[in-house]
Amino acid sequence: MDCKRRQGPGPGVPPKRARGHLWDEDEPSPSQFEANLALLEEIEAENRLQEAEEELQLPPEGTVGGQFSTADIDPRWRRPTLRALDPSTEPLIFQQLEIDHYVGSAPPLPEGPLPSRNSVPILRAFGVTDEGFSVCCHIQGFAPYFYTPAPPGFGAEHLSELQQELNAAISRDQRGGKELSGPAVLAIELCSRESMFGYHGHGPSPFLRITLALPRLMAPARRLLEQGVRVPGLGTPSFAPYEANVDFEIRFMVDADIVGCNWLELPAGKYVRRAEKKATLCQLEVDVLWSDVISHPPEGQWQRIAPLRVLSFDIECAGRKGIFPEPERDPVIQICSLGLRWGEPEPFLRLALTLRPCAPILGAKVQSYEREEDLLQAWADFILAMDPDVITGYNIQNFDLPYLISRAQALKVDRFPFLGRVTGLRSNIRDSSFQSRQVGRRDSKVISMVGRVQMDMLQVLLREHKLRSYTLNAVSFHFLGEQKEDVQHSIITDLQNGNEQTRRRLAVYCLKDAFLPLRLLERLMVLVNNVEMARVTGVPLGYLLTRGQQVKVVSQLLRQAMRQGLLMPVVKTEGSEDYTGATVIEPLKGYYDVPIATLDFSSLYPSIMMAHNLCYTTLLRPGAAQKLGLKPDEFIKTPTGDEFVKSSVRKGLLPQILENLLSARKRAKAELAQETDPLRRQVLDGRQLALKVSANSVYGFTGAQVGKLPCLEISQSVTGFGRQMIEKTKQLVESKYTVENGYDANAKVVYGDTDSVMCRFGVSSVAEAMSLGREAANWVSSHFPSPIRLEFEKVYFPYLLISKKRYAGLLFSSRSDAHDKMDCKGLEAVRRDNCPLVANLVTSSLRRILVDRDPDGAVAHAKDVISDLLCNRIDISQLVITKELTRAAADYAGKQAHVELAERMRKRDPGSAPSLGDRVPYVIIGAAKGVAAYMKSEDPLFVLEHSLPIDTQYYLEQQLAKPLLRIFEPILGEGRAESVLLRGDHTRCKTVLTSKVGGLLAFTKRRNCCIGCRSVIDHQGAVCKFCQPRESELYQKEVSHLNALEERFSRLWTQCQRCQGSLHEDVICTSRDCPIFYMRKKVRKDLEDQERLLQRFGPPGPEAW
């Protein structure tokens, strides 16, 4: 529904045609969604049909239950019937999806120690077996701990005394909190470890390992030790903590060698099944000691993904006119759900729960309720019956789930908010805020649903893709190539209050809104990619969706450090230091009608770190090399003056991690090339991508000044080597490939950026450029230490180099006789901070220049578009600009167009006004001279409805001018480009619409003009007395214009009917992401005006008959 698309109600994907023309070709075929619903009955395997009806996981007494009876549930919706399992003879093997912990009492285990206290930390792993059974594994016996260096003179005799003192200090500190049921410190042990920060040359030193009773005691224990704890005979030394800021789950996974989403095995006889007094709704619930858990690395057969159950859902609300739905007052009228078993091609479940009767939908089960309370409880019971592992949808995190929970609370449906897998644990809503320089501030909500993974596709797209608009319609068109009907929230109430057929139409629409996120999840491989990223980095799946980047590197660092007896210190950061970034070789701007070879350093920053052994563990402090007596060939001095020992002295942790990641990626790519199974290919592709991203993020981890372990010396040394290598590559290429050395021409590096150089070898064919590019890459690589390697990547021909970070060209990579694509970097063709007209014009101009090799045609086309703009012939959908509302109006330093418009819209209609985090669509309208641009922003629909004039001069000067000059100056010359494009006859004719509201119109009187000569007439007729002889001719002309408008409107109407999947129902779509919507609105208004004009001719006279 439209009311939940508030995360960016901006304009959509740029249309295929510039200049506002109607799409005569390539019209979308009628929607097949409703027909596809009928496939449900054909996609279930025979064995599912033969299974006996299984036992429904009954809700906890007093918490859930309700209106969704077992008779309403198709047996195929439930999990497979649980087979008999004997823990004494059969192992339990499952893929874990989520790991968390709680504090409780642990039941006794075979061969395990008896619990010594009532409250102990217990880890909880939720997962799925190969047969599809849901599992909850309670893992006991693991306690939180951290390290600290032993003070000078500290011996074994001080251990008990320090433990007593620390216990007493923690007990005093925790007096105001929960009372401890036993000692806070379980043990303190002496051990030999070494800090990973810096090379000291003395090897391991004495450390204390402090084990605590509960994870929540880590913070106070660390603080008290930093302040100082009395040790008899040693005074009150201060203790520096190591690994005290590591999450309890990460600590356990590192120690147990468990990675995210891998397969766990519980050996026979080592675990106990909970048959009674289960704490969760999972089919299998077991207890096991942490040391008995076998973790399988995700390789070979253990790379597979279990048959996870994925649920996608969408809700519809009946809001009041002009007011955004509020859960305290506005009812939930429909909840539609689709279920998919991972690995199967089609959903196995389609369910529409509706308030009031609804006509049947082919291929879907429809259940109707008279009371909203019953509808809500039925969906909650359905969740427990279906038992999804992953829940997805579009904006479910900030709208659907919070609305359902809040609405149930308002209606006092007390048994509703138990949507997780833990018995009696409520699903609560918590506000969350994220802010960064890249994305600004984003407010969101977090809904606890323990045991189920939430994957909101809107949040995924916001994090991973830069789009012009993030409405479901826009992203579906961008990634899936299909549009959807978008119904305004005010119309939804009318459909609900209609009849069974209107409610059926609403249910089909709601089912489509639940179906598209599922399609996006599969098409973008979101689940597979995140599972593989969790496996590669070693963190739980949920961390990837809710946490930042650093935890992924910390996990890998801890694993590698543990094997070598190294510890990670707790570093306090200020975040004030900065360093010089990568080198950009000054571009030789111009239009190159010769092949330009691009040479690229493969994994540049990881390669530098490996080649030069750059790591925390190899860093030498100033003067340390001399103090340690290191020989000159045992350490290096980086271009920034920092020193690191070579791998012959000590192999760094980071280089080892990077080697493992890159070698694993190489293996994954080799397996991918041989694999034929589509599911295995998806997993392998996701794995190689996760390995690549993880390798590249290691450098960013060292450079993050506010982070777990920042190290300016590493990050600035990496960029220093990178700058040096780019410059050396330029020198090597230009010195070898010369006429003196027998080549056809002197090579020239025309541009270099971070990890690549663009070379002009002076040859005329792409094949020759490819050959020389490969030769040059191999020759330059021989001058750098392994594994640094320069590779031939592609050839641009022709190539338009505009400035730093801005260029375009036809890309050849695999074949020399056909280009792969037109590649643009940094140009308005790929940017989203301007109107679609700019992207379309830049793209079409580049296509004429690069593909057609017709610069004159490109100039002529640009002049035509500018003329159309000034004459008001461009469709308004092409002129819409979108900007994200990242802060409140008061927080912006200056006035912003989109912020001011949002405030005005809020005063007009608070319900439909944009909110924080939305992308605000606007156009710039004409106003008095000197009015600031931010005051001229207006809602595109408001502009259409009130015929407000567009400020075409603004679009020419502020939107089109600079992008066009950037493209054409290298071709026409700096002085000539402006005079040819922005001056001349094509800019002299302008058309300005007359506004229907505001301004001087309030003080003027409208008078009729003759349709023929435009002179003022003092009667209601159509023509003056001088044009009366031509009245029939003028009438025919206006009738012809009316017919053309009617035909255009019919074509647009039919196109919208095809999109909505019905050719006999009214079009109610209001998708602002669709250019057809604006065209339809404009033509409807033009039709009304034309009909009024024809009425001035009056009824036909007797002579007409």
UniProtKB/Swiss-Prot annotation:
Activity regulation, free text: Regulated by alteration of quaternary structure. Exhibits burst rates of DNA synthesis are about 5 times faster in the presence of POLD4 (Pol-delta4 complex) than in its absence (Pol-delta3 complex), while the affinity of the enzyme for its DNA and dNTP substrates appears unchanged. The Pol-delta3 complex is more likely to proofread DNA synthesis because it cleaves single-stranded DNA twice as fast and transfers mismatched DNA from the polymerase to the exonuclease sites 9 times faster compared to the Pol-delta3 complex.
Pfam families on file: DNA_pol_B (PF00136), DNA_pol_B_exo1 (PF03104), POL3_N (PF24055), zf-C4pol (PF14260)
GO CC annotation, single: delta DNA polymerase complex
Modified residues (Omega-N-methylarginine): R19
Sites where the protein binds Zn(2+): C1010, C1013, C1024, C1027
Cofactor(s) of this protein: [4Fe-4S] cluster
Cofactor note: Binds 1 [4Fe-4S] cluster.
Gene Ontology molecular function terms on file: 3'-5' exonuclease activity; 4 iron, 4 sulfur cluster binding; chromatin binding; damaged DNA binding; DNA-directed DNA polymerase activity; enzyme binding; nucleotide binding; zinc ion binding
Catalytic activity: DNA(n) + a 2'-deoxyribonucleoside 5'-triphosphate = DNA(n+1) + diphosphate
Zinc finger map (CysA-type): 1010-1027
Binding of [4Fe-4S] cluster, residues: C1056, C1059, C1069, C1074
Primary location group: nucleus
Protein location: Nucleus
Cross-link Glycyl lysine isopeptide (Lys-Gly) (interchain with G-Cter in SUMO2) placement: K572
Domain of life: Eukaryota
Protein EC: 2.7.7.7, 3.1.11.-
Record region (Disordered): 1-31
Keyword tags: 4Fe-4S, DNA damage, DNA excision, DNA repair, DNA replication, DNA-binding, DNA-directed DNA polymerase, Exonuclease, Hydrolase, Iron, Iron-sulfur, Isopeptide bond, Metal-binding, Methylation, Nuclease, Nucleotidyltransferase, Nucleus, Transferase, Ubl conjugation, Zinc, Zinc-finger
Residue ranges of the motif Nuclear localization signal: 4-19
Gene3D superfamilies hit by this protein: 6.10.140.1540, DNA polymerase family B, C-terminal domain (1.10.132.60), DNA Polymerase, chain B, domain 1 (3.30.342.10), Helix hairpin bin (1.10.287.690), Palm domain of DNA polymerase (3.90.1600.10), Ribonuclease H-like superfamily/Ribonuclease H (3.30.420.10)
Cited function: As the catalytic component of the trimeric (Pol-delta3 complex) and tetrameric DNA polymerase delta complexes (Pol-delta4 complex), plays a crucial role in high fidelity genome replication, including in lagging strand synthesis, and repair. Exhibits both DNA polymerase and 3'- to 5'-exonuclease activities. Requires the presence of accessory proteins POLD2, POLD3 and POLD4 for full activity. Depending upon the absence (Pol-delta3) or the presence of POLD4 (Pol-delta4), displays differences in catalytic activity.
Family: Belongs to the DNA polymerase type-B family.
Domain notes: The CysB motif binds 1 4Fe-4S cluster and is required for the formation of polymerase complexes.
Protein known as: DNA polymerase delta catalytic subunit
Source organism phylogeny: Eukaryota, Metazoa, Chordata, Craniata, Vertebrata
